[in-house]
Amino acid sequence: PTRRSSDLHRHKNVLLYRQGEINFILNAEPDSFAQRFARLHGPSVCAIAFRVHDAKAAYERALNLGAWGYAGQAGPGELNIPAIKGIGDSLIYLVDRWRGKGGAQPGDIGNIGFFDVDFVPLPGVGSAEMLAPKGHGLKVIDHLTHNVHRGRMAEWAAFYERLFNFREIKYFDIEGQITGVKSKAMTSPCGKIRIPINEEGKDKPGQIQEYLDSYKGEGIQHIAMTSDDLYATVDGLRASAMRLLDTPDTYYELVDQRIPEHGEDVQALRARKILIDGKKDAILLQIFSENQLGPIFFEFIQRKGNEGFGEGNFKALFETMELDQMRRGVLKAPEAAGAEK
């Protein structure tokens, strides 16, 4: 959903896609970690990166606390970026070089980042567009939601807590007609990295288990990105043929009752199928794509003083997805399930 690629790796079959401060790297390099990961999981997210003040110190600290290191192979002129094993044996890279670090200004000596070293702009891409293309108005990655096996949510929450000093900011326990989901939302000390961790809430396999079966293991369920104008972003995404989830019209009939004085144009929300949550003066707008990379999907979100995750929409969305599973035969409707007992 970002745009055409803006940069090509200097030595490898790797493309960089950028929008705002979002960077997606598509790796098609033969015999790479990414290709081996894809052979197991199919279309997937094989790595994420955290900005840290000192990558070497952060890496050594993580190893001392029990993390598993990854020994990558840097090519000529490339940065050797340390990484540890993360969710589902994906990687977490620790990056300590980026533009603007420590208040550095454009033109300052040494104000270069990882992408400046390893990538070159494609022909026709200007410097301003290369650094922060506007695209559909997406700004930053808001959160990265993980799906894990039942009973492993607390273990992964402790992983982020122990290695990176994350803390829990939200806990959810949502029940549908047949299945359920539990989730712990973790955040980094700076508040810029949010990672909700989901597991099945009941014995009956549901949406989380379907993901785990499809993905062949634990991993990132969806990537959420922010916008300062979600209405315009959704219009742009639809014009680009992005498939977004539908929301029944009945949802919008209750918006004014559910969130008095929300200040949004309900007809504009309805026309774009945008969801709304929160309360007066603390509103969150969100919409989800259909699955885009195997079982992985995207969320597009606008925060207006609300730091939640759309909790008020969770149950409605969960039940909608559960109904879809029933229609596809993944779950049996309650009557059918009861008839077999």
Give the role of each language-model region:
Residues M153-F159, I220:
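A conserved active-site cap/scaffold subdomain adjacent to cofactor or substrate pockets
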Residues G217:
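Long C-terminal interaction/binding lobes of large macromolecular proteins
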